[in-house]
Amino acid sequence: MVTIGNAHDDLIHDAVLDYYGKRLATCSSDKTIKIFDLDGTDNYKLITTLTGHEGPVWQVSWAHPKFGSILASCSYDGKALIWKEQPETQQWSIIAEHTVHQASVNSVSWAPHELGAVLLCTSSDGKVSVVDFNDDGTTSHVIFDAHAIGANSATWAPVSTSSKDSAALKQQRRIVSCGSDNLAKIWKYDAANNTYVEEAKLEGHTDWVRDVAWSPSNLIRSYIATASQDRTVLIWTQDRDGKWQKQLLTEEKFPDVCWRCSWSLSGNILAVSGGDNKVSLWKENLQGKWESAGEVDQ
């Protein structure tokens, strides 16, 4: 485990490893993003500090390496910024600004690489936007109303086809969002109208849903986790019949607000972080019940 001390001058809101686990990007209320090189031991080196946001930076997301060394960030300033490293100079610069939202942009998430360079954003204006970065250098976006009081987070469904046809892949686009209306919603791309339509509404929380995570594994069934201010995490499963069933991760409420939830790459372990400054790990047993798999030690 690597501990990076005094990285920022204010609260750190996110820390994400790149695809290879060699670089760490962090972001903070100090309006900056920092990128560190990790060497697999306890050593790390600060590569660069990125400045460009005018407010706290809430989240960062690495693009798949097939698109280059690219990072997306979002901020209270209402912007999502796209940063790229030039391999020759190793200098980072802003290559795109996404400014369609009217309030804080709360999350950014790149689509599975099979779908192309596509970025998903949520905002306190209640809207979700999806931005396509096209091969010819142009961009196009779709923006739609999702959660009336504010959209807090969103993520992509895993791709379930090996098709290379771009039109067929676009039809595969499904996302799940969550918001301050206590709901999570599943959306499917509607090619005829070039928008996203609500496919399902996941009702079960009694307070704001702070985070949502769609498991990358969907071999047997689909799993979605939602983390809420009501101090619970719900696991939603979809079998072949298409209906979503909910289950409490644990019968006992968490000690504090559940801020984030995240699946392992294999999709069998869920990490939950909360207001008690702890990260707990959970795994489904053979009976379909979720049990503790320990905590991440600080």
UniProtKB/Swiss-Prot annotation:
WD repeat copies, ranges: 7-46, 52-93, 100-141, 146-197, 204-246, 253-292
GO process annotations (BP): COPII-coated vesicle budding; ERAD pathway; mRNA transport; nuclear pore localization; positive regulation of DNA-templated transcription; positive regulation of ER to Golgi vesicle-mediated transport; positive regulation of protein exit from endoplasmic reticulum; positive regulation of TOR signaling
UniProt keyword Transport present: yes
Recorded GO CC terms: COPII vesicle coat; endoplasmic reticulum membrane; GATOR2 complex; nuclear pore outer ring
Subunit note: The COPII coat is composed of at least 5 proteins: the SEC23/24 complex, the SEC13/31 complex, and the protein SAR1. Component of the nuclear pore complex (NPC). NPC constitutes the exclusive means of nucleocytoplasmic transport. NPCs allow the passive diffusion of ions and small molecules and the active, nuclear transport receptor-mediated bidirectional transport of macromolecules such as proteins, RNAs, ribonucleoparticles (RNPs), and ribosomal subunits across the nuclear envelope. Due to its 8-fold rotational symmetry, all subunits are present with 8 copies or multiples thereof.
Extra remark beyond the main annotation: Has antigenic properties.
Protein task: Component of the coat protein complex II (COPII) which promotes the formation of transport vesicles from the endoplasmic reticulum (ER). The coat has two main functions, the physical deformation of the endoplasmic reticulum membrane into vesicles and the selection of cargo molecules. It also functions as a component of the nuclear pore complex (NPC). NPC components, collectively referred to as nucleoporins (NUPs), can play the role of both NPC structural components and of docking or interaction partners for transiently associated nuclear transport factors.
UniProt name for this protein: Protein transport protein SEC13
Encoding gene, per UniProt annotation: SEC13
